[in-house]
Structures are given as C-alpha cells and as structure tokens.
A protein has these predicted regions:
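Conserved N-terminal substructure of TIR/SEFIR domains
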Residues: 143-144
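Charged interaction/catalytic cores of defense and host-pathogen modules
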Residues: 1-139
C-alpha cells in the first residue's frame, strides 16, 4: 500500500543528499558574505539520525546519513517532520555571524526558498515539486 510520503522517493538522488548535508552551492549573498544550507559534519548527521529516531545507522560518507534519514522518513511516513528538522532555523549556525536578528530571519527565509528551488530544479523531469505550505513540506505535482 502506498503511503502519503511515497512521493518523497523522487528526492532519492545522491545530488540531493549531498545538497542537504551542506555540500551544495551558496544560495544567498548578504553584506558580501555567501550563505547556503548548513554544512553538517558526520558526527552532527549521526546526532540528527539519533534525534529523529534512527538508531541503526551504517555511516560512511556524509551523504549516506542523509540517504538513510530519507529512507527511514519515507518508511515511517515522517518526511514533513524530517524536512522541518533539516530546515529548522536552529540548524543554520552558519548565520550566527549576522548581528541583526531581523537580517538573520530574512537570510534564513531566502536560503530556504532558494534551497527548495534548487531541489525542484533537480527533480523537474518528474513533474513533481517540493513545496512548503502552512509550515509543512510536501511533494506535489507541478502547478498544483
């Protein structure tokens, strides 16, 4: 039986795993500094796995942790929860050098918007897209 999160399988690509673990392009320039998704070290990814309830992690490359997290989230029907965790503002420690909190919030929102655009570009041929609506992430048919 297909689950509500089966559409997230379209994200099962190494390119997306690497992007989500912080090995992607800078997405926003603010006052001459460039920002993207947080860069997660292996130990941080391991901690994220534990926090999310995934206790048996094989490890290896950093992208493998993200792959296992996504597989687990799809299996457990918790993809929205996973993406809210990965995109939580508290994860963006790379923004801590911005002094003004309003600017931090603005840069954070811009990064999330650009990150979704980046992911959607990567999956565009599937005719599906990642959207963030009313505080929740979901995969929908393009234009719906």
């Amino acid at each position: 039986m297909a689950g509500k999160d089966d559409n997230f399988k379209v994200l099962k690509k190494k390119e997306i795993y690497e992007f989500l673990e912080g090995n992607g392009p800078f997405l926003v320039t603010h006052n001459g500094a460039e920002y993207g998704l947080p860069y997660y070290k292996g130990t941080q990814l391991s901690s994220l796995c534990t926090e999310f309830g995934l206790t048996e992690v094989v490890g290896g490359s950093r992208w493998c942790y993200v792959e296992e997290l996504l597989d687990y989230a799809i299996e457990q029907q918790r993809c929205d929860e996973l993406f809210r965790l990965l995109f939580s503002e508290k994860q963006f420690t790379n923004l801590q050098d911005i002094a003004d909190m309003n600017e931090v919030d603005d840069v954070y929102r811009q990064i999330v918007k650009k990150a979704i655009e980046y992911i959607n570009h990567s999956i565009r041929l599937s005719r599906k897209e990642l959207v963030f609506i009313n505080g929740h992430f979901m995969i929908v048919e393009v234009g719906k």
